[in-house]
């Protein structure tokens, strides 16, 4: 059995696979700040239930897994993981905490081309997280907030966009409308990236893909359905195992 560990900026994902089948997985709400001894302890707990033959690491905080047998770059892992879940995929959108990645892949999941957004852009998972903090919206309640009145957030920079959110709140603009504006801001940063790579069958991976309202807006803007795995947060981890 192979254990994959994907240490992201905000979450850590672990997946156990045998003969290309997912046996077990877990998602922890702690990312790159996780200590290596904590990771080792988690691995030892898994080893009490399953025999681990090999450990592979990926993600923004992959350096925290120095005990891994193999390190796989995120972009390569994402392509392979997307292909595992949807073999018709020719593209991937991954909105991570630190950046947004858009990939063009071939029929084997090999990355042909990719674009990374600026980590300072108002289009990352971290920006969405910060917006939720300002709006005092629990991330677990996020799908309850929806509105047809979309507030305009025009800044390309996350810091200035956050200032716009505070300004809109002070003007008594409803939270729902501001949140929809945040979604639109994120989507508007990603669509030019997908257009540039000319991708059609797109896998949406990462925690943001669990946001039903954002996905609905995204699909409307793209005029197509996105391919979303049952658990979109483990795509990169699965791909790292399969590389």
Swiss-Prot record:
Detail which positions bind [4Fe-4S] cluster.
120, 157
- List the CDD domains hit by this protein, alphabetically: ASKHA_NBD_YjiL-like
Q: Which cofactor does it need?
A: [4Fe-4S] cluster
Q: How does it assemble?
A: Homodimer.
| Keyword vocabulary terms for this entry | 4Fe-4S, Iron, Iron-sulfur, Metal-binding
Q: How is the cofactor bound?
A: Binds 1 [4Fe-4S] cluster per dimer.
Q: What is this protein called?
A: Uncharacterized protein MJ0004
Q: Name one GO molecular function term.
A: 4 iron, 4 sulfur cluster binding
Organism of origin: Methanocaldococcus jannaschii (strain ATCC 43067 / DSM 2661 / JAL-1 / JCM 10045 / NBRC 100440) (Methanococcus jannaschii)
The record's listing under Gene3D superfamilies reads:
3.30.420.40
Under InterPro entries, the record lists: ATPase_BadF, ATPase_NBD, CoA_E_activase_dom, Dehydratase_Activator_Redct
| Highest taxon above the source species | Archaea
User: Record keywords: Ribonucleoprotein included?
Assistant: no
């Amino acid at each position: 059995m192979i254990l994959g560990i994907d240490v992201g900026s905000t979450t850590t994902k672990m997946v156990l696979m045998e003969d290309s089948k997912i046996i077990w997985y877990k998602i922890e709400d702690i990312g790159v700040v996780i200590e290596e001894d904590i990771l080792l302890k988690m691995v030892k707990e898994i080893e009490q239930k399953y025999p681990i033959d090999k450990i592979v690491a990926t993600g923004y905080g992959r350096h925290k897994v120095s005990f891994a047998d193999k390190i796989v770059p995120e972009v390569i892992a994402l392509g392979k993981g997307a292909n595992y879940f949807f073999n018709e995929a020719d593209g991937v959108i991954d909105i991570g905490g630190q950046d947004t990645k858009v990939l063009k892949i071939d029929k084997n999941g090999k990355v042909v081309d990719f674009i990374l957004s600026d980590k300072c852009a108002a289009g990352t998972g971290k920006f969405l997280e910060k917006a939720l903090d300002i709006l005092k919206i629990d991330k677990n309640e996020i799908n309850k907030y929806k509105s047809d009145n979309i507030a305009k957030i025009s800044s390309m920079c996350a810091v200035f966009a956050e200032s716009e959110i505070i300004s809109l709140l002070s003007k008594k603009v409803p939270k729902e409308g501001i949140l929809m504006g945040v979604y639109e801001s994120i989507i508007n940063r990603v669509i030019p990236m997908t257009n540039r790579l000319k991708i059609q069958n797109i896998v949406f991976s990462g925690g943001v893909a669990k946001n039903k309202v954002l996905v609905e807006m995204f699909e409307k803007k793209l005029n197509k359905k996105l391919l979303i795995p049952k658990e979109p947060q483990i795509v990169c981890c699965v791909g790292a195992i399969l590389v």
